[in-house]
Regions:
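Conserved GTPase G-domain signal focused on the G5
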Residues: 79-81, 191-194
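Short, structured loop/turn "capping" segments at alpha-beta junctions
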Residues: 175-179, 193-197, 207-214, 240-242
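Helix-rich C-terminal "collar"/helical-bundle subdomain used as an assembly and partner-interaction module
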Residues: 229-309
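Loop-to-helix "switch" segment enriched in basic
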Residues: 208-235
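C-terminal helical "lid" of AAA+/P-loop NTPase domains
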Residues: 102, 183-188, 194-206, 231-232, ...
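P-loop/Walker A NTP-binding region and its immediately flanking N-terminal helices
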Residues: 1-155, 160-161, 171, 184, ...
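Short conserved motifs of the RecA-like P-loop NTPase core
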Residues: 165, 176-188, 212-213, 225-226
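Alpha-helix N-cap/N′ positions at the starts of helices
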Residues: 14, 177-180, 221-229, 238
């Protein structure tokens, strides 16, 4: 995408840096604002679906505090060595700032041993260091950690608010668009605003003379009915390779909606074995967080469902 304005990733360019520009979660914003006025915060766990603003909120907080901070992505650094070496090392070093903050992004990837070690560090350095953890699945955070934090659910803004925000960004970038262009985009990726913005970035065309317009390539959007096709194929005892092809053709890298549909509609394709389906989905949904190729993981689930027919 070319633009006569600052050329950067839209998702970063329009990441809010002020609480008042953060969309939604008004009660949480009021609570955090009170803490920031005192230049201190509690330990927090922010949880919610991908792309709903958990990390953005954490970064707004550290941007407003007079603090030193350490940022770690726990999906990359998830072991006890990271907690002992980097987190404890940071917390134990003297600082000229009145406060230190550790952000552990995607903390639900931390091993149980790492979480247990973190619990002790939170207690040991409670006078000087605060911790902000973000996660998609709060149930994967051990209870002793949750009890030492304020656990706050970050609720995504409504589809209408997401569409309104995207329209505002497009206008700011002087990108011509039709409001109907945003409907399939929001329906496809909601509540993940990050994916919406990345798709807009890929779909913005330079018409010459700085005339920018949005042209959504339908191949970028996952077919809205591929989930129905998978369910129908399972019901009709379609061969595994044919179902695998349906999934491959969807171009999806996020199968949360398919997991949910397989659970909700188990009676349609495996009547009498809904409990077995629930167990299989639970196992593969958990494994999806640790697999590089999620298509292989979902295909494995489909194979096991077929084998239970």
């Amino acid at each position: 995408m070319k633009n006569n304005k600052e050329n950067s990733l839209l998702v970063e360019k329009y990441r809010p840096t002020e609480l008042e520009n953060y969309v939604g979660n008004e009660q949480i914003k009021d609570k955090i604002s009170t803490y920031l006025n005192q230049n201190d915060i509690q330990n927090f766990i922010f949880y919610g679906p991908a792309g709903c603003g958990k990390t953005t909120l954490a970064k707004i907080i550290i941007g407003k505090l007079d603090c030193d901070y350490l940022y770690l992505n726990a999906s990359d650094e998830r072991g006890i060595e990271t907690i002992r070496d980097k987190v404890q090392g940071f917390a134990s070093v003297a600082s000229f700032k009145p406060l230190k903050v550790v952000i552990l992004d995607e903390a639900d990837f931390l091993t149980i041993q790492a979480q247990a070690s973190l619990r002790n560090i939170i207690e040991t350095f409670s006078r000087t260091t605060r911790f902000i953890m973000t996660c998609n699945f709060v149930e994967r955070i051990i209870d002793p950690l949750q009890s030492r934090c304020q656990v706050l659910k970050i609720v995504p803004p409504s589809k209408k608010d997401v569409a309104r925000h995207l329209a505002w960004i497009l206008n700011q970038e002087s990108i011509s668009f039709e409001i109907n262009d945003l409907v399939p985009l929001v329906n496809q990726y909601y509540p993940d605003l990050r994916k919406c913005l990345n798709t807009i970035q890929l779909s913005t065309v330079d018409g010459g003379a700085n005339d920018l317009y949005l042209r959504l390539d339908q191949s970028i959007l996952v077919s809205s009915n591929y989930i129905d096709k998978v369910i129908k194929a399972l019901s009709n005892k379609t061969k595994f390779n044919d179902i695998r092809q349906i999934i491959a053709d969807s171009n999806s890298d996020d199968f949360d909606e398919l997991f949910r549909a397989l659970y909700d509609r188990a009676t349609e394709y495996l009547p009498g074995k809904e409990g077995t389906v629930a167990i299989l989905i639970n196992e593969h949904q958990y494994k999806a967080n640790f697999r590089i190729d999620k298509e292989i993981n979902i295909s494995s689930l489909i194979s096991q469902i077929i084998n239970n027919k």
